[in-house]
Swiss-Prot record:
GO cellular component entries: cytoplasm
Binding locations of Zn(2+): 131, 135, 141
Organism of this sequence: Oleidesulfovibrio alaskensis (strain ATCC BAA-1058 / DSM 17464 / G20) (Desulfovibrio alaskensis)
Enzyme class at the top of the EC tree: hydrolase
Protein name in UniProt: Endoribonuclease YbeY
Gene that specifies this protein: ybeY
Nuclease is among the record's keywords: yes
Family: Belongs to the endoribonuclease YbeY family.
Annotated PROSITE patterns: UPF0054 (PS01306)
Gene Ontology biological process: rRNA processing
Keywords: Cytoplasm, Endonuclease, Hydrolase, Metal-binding, Nuclease, Ribosome biogenesis, rRNA processing, Zinc
Length: 169
């Protein structure tokens, strides 16, 4: 189950609808073999992002996405570091009801960074959601996470294109 909570004003001008986010996250979770997992997404503004960043990480200022895992890693990489994982439909975690945790996405950061990186805002938002989801699933920063982020982007955009539900990819 995917729960999406929006703070006042956070959706203004945001490039993805709640439905788009749900479809993309369902595709990403399926690729991780976590189709039945629970994830909460909070779409927030820079002020709340900065508050959460300071309170939980001791850092000042807003950040793009924060991941708050509910428990220990559930889908930690199982391959050798030089072998990036692929979409796994046969994972032992498939179709379970694991609570992965909460993602807090700053919609302001999506707009700023998409301009800074020259990416369409909807693609940058998806990339940040993939990144945060991988943290919830037990991945740490590094080449394997980078590869897996791209894999999840392909899963999300391929699913969206096939179903013609999410537009703009």
């Amino acid at each position: 189950m995917i729960v999406i909570t929006t703070r006042t004003g956070a959706m203004t001008g945001f490039p993805l609808s709640r439905h788009d986010i749900r479809i993309a996250l369902h595709s990403m979770l399926s690729c991780l073999g976590l189709s039945g997992a629970h994830v909460e997404v909070i779409l927030t503004d820079d002020g709340e992002s900065a508050q959460l960043n300071r309170e939980f990480l001791g850092c000042y200022g807003p950040t793009n996405i924060l991941s708050f895992p509910a428990a220990g890693p559930v889908a930690a990489p199982r391959q050798e570091p030089d072998s990036p994982p692929a979409c796994r439909k046969d994972s032992s975690h498939a179709e379970d009801d694991t609570d992965l945790g909460v993602l807090a996405l700053s919609t302001g950061a999506v707009h700023r960074e998409s301009f800074l990186y020259g990416q369409p805002p909807h693609r940058h938002a998806l990339r940040l959601l993939a990144h945060g989801l991988l943290h919830l699933a037990g991945y740490d920063h590094g080449p394997q996470m980078d590869d897996m982020t791209e894999t999840l982007m392909q899963c999300a955009t391929g699913k969206a294109a096939a179903d013609t539900v999410v537009t703009g990819f």
